[in-house]
UniProtKB/Swiss-Prot annotation:
<dbReference type="GO" id="GO:0006730">
    <property type="term" value="P:one-carbon metabolic process"/>
</dbReference>
<dbReference type="Pfam" id="PF02772">
    <property type="entry name" value="S-AdoMet_synt_M"/>
</dbReference>
<dbReference type="InterPro" id="IPR022629">
    <property type="entry name" value="S-AdoMet_synt_central"/>
</dbReference>
<dbReference type="InterPro" id="IPR022631">
    <property type="entry name" value="ADOMET_SYNTHASE_CS"/>
</dbReference>
<feature type="binding site">
    <location>
        <position position="274"/>
    </location>
    <ligand>
        <name>ATP</name>
    </ligand>
</feature>
<feature type="binding site">
    <location>
        <position position="251"/>
    </location>
    <ligand>
        <name>ATP</name>
    </ligand>
</feature>
<comment type="similarity">
    <text>Belongs to the AdoMet synthase family.</text>
</comment>
<dbReference type="Pfam" id="PF00438">
    <property type="entry name" value="S-AdoMet_synt_N"/>
</dbReference>
<dbReference type="GO" id="GO:0000287">
    <property type="term" value="F:magnesium ion binding"/>
</dbReference>
<keyword id="KW-0479">Metal-binding</keyword>
<dbReference type="GO" id="GO:0006556">
    <property type="term" value="P:S-adenosylmethionine biosynthetic process"/>
</dbReference>
<feature type="binding site" description="in other chain">
    <location>
        <begin position="174"/>
        <end position="176"/>
    </location>
    <ligand>
        <name>ATP</name>
    </ligand>
</feature>
<protein>
    <recommendedName>
        <fullName>S-adenosylmethionine synthase</fullName>
        <ecNumber>2.5.1.6</ecNumber>
    </recommendedName>
</protein>
<feature type="binding site">
    <location>
        <position position="278"/>
    </location>
    <ligand>
        <name>ATP</name>
    </ligand>
</feature>
<feature type="binding site" description="in other chain">
    <location>
        <position position="57"/>
    </location>
    <ligand>
        <name>L-methionine</name>
    </ligand>
</feature>
<feature type="binding site">
    <location>
        <position position="44"/>
    </location>
    <ligand>
        <name>K(+)</name>
    </ligand>
</feature>
<dbReference type="InterPro" id="IPR002133">
    <property type="entry name" value="S-AdoMet_synthetase"/>
</dbReference>
Length: 401
């Protein structure tokens, strides 16, 4: 296992066009789950110049049944879309929450898919699709996330907070960040490069205003990344020059195109399935959450300093096909023993789709906040981000006492 290397991760802001699409899709998921906790949703969003299009499949009691929309339902969907765009902050000529065109092409879920997923008298609820999902944790940061991604997210979160508060009125919603760290002995010792590209108000690409923008970004970086890591950093701030046209007006956005930003910044494998726009019967989402939860608790319990967990499902089948643990030669016990310990935790109730949703409480409108700045490494707060809890630590320790 390599211990000395350079590694890089990137993040994108809430105003990035793909993230606008993710947030709209998850706002729709939340809308339907607030009406029916057992709703089925697969909502894809396209955003481009003054246009938002929804497409996908749904089933929701009291909202869409037997091929018909309930009175007022489509108006509520449109309001949810516009409110989401407004919250992000888009009031530009090329993309404005109030003036954009909205097209709704959501329709009913296939009965053939539903019959494989729904529980029946003779079977438990099946997985919503086949697939492999991964979870990961590392002790590099307090949130047990890869440091490169952790810092990339925090830079953009801080910039967005300053934009919303008015502290940085020259910022516009679209932005990207990228952080390269040098590792020695598997620990980050220096940030060798920081890249920040941010949409800005007119005039901030030259002269004194450009210098003001650059100094602002460097201040944010210095408040996010420890000074000891910034001694040899090269900064690349809006390296192409002007960035006035951005967001969906600059590039079309689609749901599910930032899956590495959403997860571990390339530090861990990814099964390929996106999260946003999907209700929690879709194991692309719920199983990725449970594997993060398990990996995080393994590291927090002191059983390893790094942990990757894979799980696999078949559509319509409730029990997982496999569970795989890899502690990357950092484990204090055998990886196979950790697998056995996980399967032996009674309060989990198993790793079926329904057991996952029940244990984590996923049938709730909790998803829009996940759709920007990462699904993982966030603070568990009430119903939100329950997969970040550390309530299996004692169970895992007890298994090896």
């Amino acid at each position: 296992m390599r211990t000395d290397y350079l590694f890089t991760s990137e993040s994108v802001s809430e105003g990035h066009p793909d993230k606008v699409s993710d947030q709209i899709s998850d706002a729709i998921v939340d809308l339907f789950l607030s009406k029916d906790p057992e709703a089925r949703i697969a909502c894809e969003t396209l955003t481009t110049t003054q246009l938002v299009v929804l497409a996908g499949e749904i089933r929701c009691k009291g909202v869409y049944e037997n091929g018909e929309w309930a009175p007022g339902a489509q108006d509520e969907i449109e309001k949810t879309v516009r409110d989401t765009v407004k919250r992000i902050g888009y009031e530009q000529d090329g993309f404005h929450w109030e003036r954009l065109e909205f097209i709704n092409r959501l329709h009913g879920q296939s009965a053939h898919i539903a019959q494989g997923v729904d529980a029946a008298d003779n079977k438990d609820e099946g997985a919503g699709d086949q697939g492999i999902m991964f979870g990961y944790a590392t002790d590099e940061t307090p949130d047990l996330m890869p440091a490169t991604l952790y810092y990339s997210h925090k830079i953009l979160e801080r910039m967005a907070a300053d934009r919303h508060s008015g502290a940085a009125p020259f910022l516009e919603p679209d932005a990207k960040s990228q952080v390269t760290l040098r590792y020695e002995g598997s620990l980050p010792v220096a940030a060798t490069a920081v890249v920040v590209s941010t949409q800005h108000a007119p005039g901030y690409d030259e002269g004194g205003k450009e210098a003001e923008l650059h100094e602002y970004v460097k201040r944010v970086v210095a408040e996010v990344i420890p000074p000891v890591l910034l001694r040899e950093t090269k900064y690349y701030i809006n390296p192409t020059g002007s960035f006035e046209i951005g967001g969906p007006d600059g590039d079309a956005g689609l749901t599910g195109r930032k899956i590495i930003v959403d997860t571990y910044g390339g530090a861990a494998p990814h099964g390929g399935g996106a999260f946003s726009g999907k209700d929690p019967t879709k194991v692309d989402r719920s199983a990725a959450y449970i594997t993060r939860y398990l990996a995080k608790n393994v590291v927090a319990a002191g059983l390893a300093t790094r942990c990757t967990i894979q799980i696999a499902y078949a559509i319509g089948v409730s029990e997982p096909l496999s569970l795989y643990v890899d502690t990357h030669e950092t484990g204090t016990v055998g990886d196979d023993k950790i697998e056995q310990a996980i399967l032996g935790i009674a309060k989990l109730g198993g790793l079926t789709p329904r057991a996952i949703r029940t244990h984590l409480g996923l049938n709730k409108p909790i998803y829009r906040p996940t759709a920007a700045y990462g699904h993982f490494g966030r603070k568990a707060d009430g119903d939100f981000f329950p997969w970040e809890r550390l309530d299996l630590v004692d169970d895992l320790k007890a298994a090896f006492a």
